[in-house]
Every structure is written in C-alpha cells, then in structure tokens.
C-alpha cells in the first residue's frame, strides 16, 4: 500500500509523533497504520509523543566555554524533581557537547544530530519513555568572540557575555551581573528610540501632573531619561559585586568593552498550566485506569 500524505497526517494525529517518524513507521509496515501504531507503542515512540504535548516549563540551563566559542542550552522538563534527575542532566550535558562540537544554533538541527549512534530525537524519546515526563530541548546558541564568559545561577538562569579585552574572569563577572540584574540592552545608546519615546511621554505626563513650570519640567524629564536608559542597560547599571562603580567603569578599569550578552532563563515565555490538587489527583486516577 502506498504511503500517502493523508496516511502520514492520520498517524501524526493519532500518535503525536513527528512527521518523519510517522512516515518511517508507515514505510516499514507497507502502509498498515494499525501495525505502525503497534510498533511505535512497543518502541516507546507513541508514548513519548503523547507526552510531548504536555507543558515542559521546568528544566536546566547549561553552558560551556572552550576554544573561542561559548555554548548555551536550555533543556526543559515538566517538574523540578526531574530537572535534578541524574539521567536528565546527563542527557543535557551530552546535548551541550553535541551542540558545541557541531556549532549548532537551531533545535531542529540539534534533534537531527547524532548522539551515541542514534539521532538526538531518538535518544530523547527513549528518555521520555523511561522517566515518564515530556523532555524538550528548547533553545541553543553558539557564539564566538575575543573574550567570552559564562555564568549559570542555580541551573535556572544562564548568561554568555562577549567582550573585547579583559579576561575570562572579567567576562564571567559581567555574565554574573547580567544574571542578577537582567539588563534589557547593552549600552544606553542601544535603547531603541521607540522605547525612549514611550518612557519620555510617561515622564512628561508625570511632570505636568506635578504642577511644575514647563522649563523645570523639561529639565526633570531630561534627568529622568538619562537615569532610565542607564537603568535598563548593562553598562549603565551599578556593578552587582561593587555598587560603587558602574559596569562601564569596571570595563574601563580593565581595558575592556562589552559587545553583547545572551541571557536564558528556564521556562521564560512558556505559559504554565495550573490545576488544583483535587483535579490533579482525579486526572492521575483516571489515567491509571487506562
């Protein structure tokens, strides 16, 4: 029997597995969809695919700096318990090595990469079947630069900093600052015009409401805008390890400059599903009956 697009679509809908996995399963069974499902269930693919639909907003951030390149990976799971699991962390570190060795910046490319003689996606499916939770590599990045630093806080926040000049220790300190202070931009002059204009409108309205004369209000707004662009930018912020100096001063004192930074935080932007305890228990009991 010919393996049609409609057949692949039906198998995807029934198992939740990826298109290529579904096509492969159908080719192996000569288009017999029921046998394909049976084989996928035996191999754990269908089970893993069903779990892939569940929200994975916990996890870990991992980093590596070596040979002029810094790599950072976010690997998600469903619970903080699994985020500390030895097998989960081992898989994460293996993915980090694969991403670094192959300069991978795309999750699809990472899933298709080879790990221990299999595709990363296949190793992931096996781990999902073993652990019983959705596990998902979410994002990965490789950057190159003159001086690179990486810092991970509690496994949940990771930062790569890219400097010119200075050394790795300085770059790590800058990365630590970014993890703690979460600046939105690198330098005050990097703050987009639309962001500046929006804040300026707010500050003008505040000044007008305060009843200040126009010339005083204008000076107030100018001062507040300078403070605002400093607060939201890395170099304008007080250095977390020594608030008596700014990050800009720290860099200048070490004959260095910051080019950019990348900050990952576990689960940011993922809408978490909330359930009350009774509903969660009821759902688990219902699942146990199946």
UniProtKB/Swiss-Prot annotation:
- Which UniProt keyword terms apply here? Cytoplasm, Elongation factor, Protein biosynthesis
Of the GO CC terms on this record, one is: cytoplasm
CDD domains, per the entry: UBA_EF-Ts
The organism's superkingdom is given as Bacteria
Identify the stretch(es) annotated as Involved in Mg(2+) ion dislocation from EF-Tu: 79-82
Write one Pfam family the protein is assigned to: EF_TS
GO terms assigned for molecular function: translation elongation factor activity
Q: Which InterPro entries match?
A: EF-Ts_dimer_sf (IPR036402), Transl_elong_EFTs/EF1B (IPR001816), Transl_elong_EFTs/EF1B_dimer (IPR014039), Transl_elong_Ts_CS (IPR018101), UBA-like_sf (IPR009060)
Grouped into one coarse class, the protein's main location is cytoplasm
Q: Where in or outside the cell is it found?
A: Cytoplasm
In UniProt terms, what function does this protein have?
Associates with the EF-Tu.GDP complex and induces the exchange of GDP to GTP. It remains bound to the aminoacyl-tRNA.EF-Tu.GTP complex up to the GTP hydrolysis stage on the ribosome.
For this protein, the record's PANTHER family field holds: ELONGATION FACTOR TS (PTHR11741), ELONGATION FACTOR TS, MITOCHONDRIAL (PTHR11741:SF0)
Q: Which NCBIfam families match?
A: tsf (TIGR00116)
Q: Which family does it belong to?
A: Belongs to the EF-Ts family.
The protein here is known as Elongation factor Ts
Give the organism, scientific name: Alteromonas mediterranea (strain DSM 17117 / CIP 110805 / LMG 28347 / Deep ecotype)
Gene it is expressed from: tsf
């Amino acid at each position: 029997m010919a393996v049609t697009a409609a057949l692949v679509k039906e198998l995807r809908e029934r198992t939740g597995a990826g298109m290529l996995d579904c096509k492969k399963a159908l080719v192996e069974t000569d288009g017999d969809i029921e046998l394909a499902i049976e084989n996928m269930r035996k191999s754990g693919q269908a089970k893993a695919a069903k779990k892939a639909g569940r929200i994975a907003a916990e996890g870990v951030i991992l980093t590596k700096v070596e040979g002029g390149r810094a790599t950072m990976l976010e690997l998600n799971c469903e619970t903080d318990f699994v985020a500390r699991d030895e097998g989960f962390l081992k898989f994460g570190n293996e993915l980090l090595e694969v991403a670094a060795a192959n300069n991978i910046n795309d999750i699809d490319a990472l899933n298709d990469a080879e790990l221990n003689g299999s595709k990363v996606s296949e190793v992931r499916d096996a781990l999902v079947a073993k652990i019983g939770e959705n596990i998902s590599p979410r994002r990965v990045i490789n950057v190159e630069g003159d001086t690179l630093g990486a810092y991970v806080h509690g496994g949940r926040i990771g930062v790569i900093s890219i400097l010119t000049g200075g050394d790795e220790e300085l770059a790590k300190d800058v990365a630590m600052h970014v993890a703690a202070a979460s600046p939105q931009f690198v330098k005050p002059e990097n703050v987009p015009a639309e962001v500046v204009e929006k804040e300026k409108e707010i500050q003008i309205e505040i000044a007008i409401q305060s009843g200040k004369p126009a010339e005083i209000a204008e000076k107030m707004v100018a001062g507040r805008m300078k403070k605002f662009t400093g607060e939201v930018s890395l170099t304008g912020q007080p250095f977390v390890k020594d608030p008596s100096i700014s990050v800009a001063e720290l860099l200048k004192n070490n004959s260095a400059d910051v080019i950019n930074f990348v900050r990952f935080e576990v689960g940011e932007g993922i809408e978490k599903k909330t359930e009350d305890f009774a509903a969660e228990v009821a759902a688990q009991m219902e699942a146990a009956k199946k």
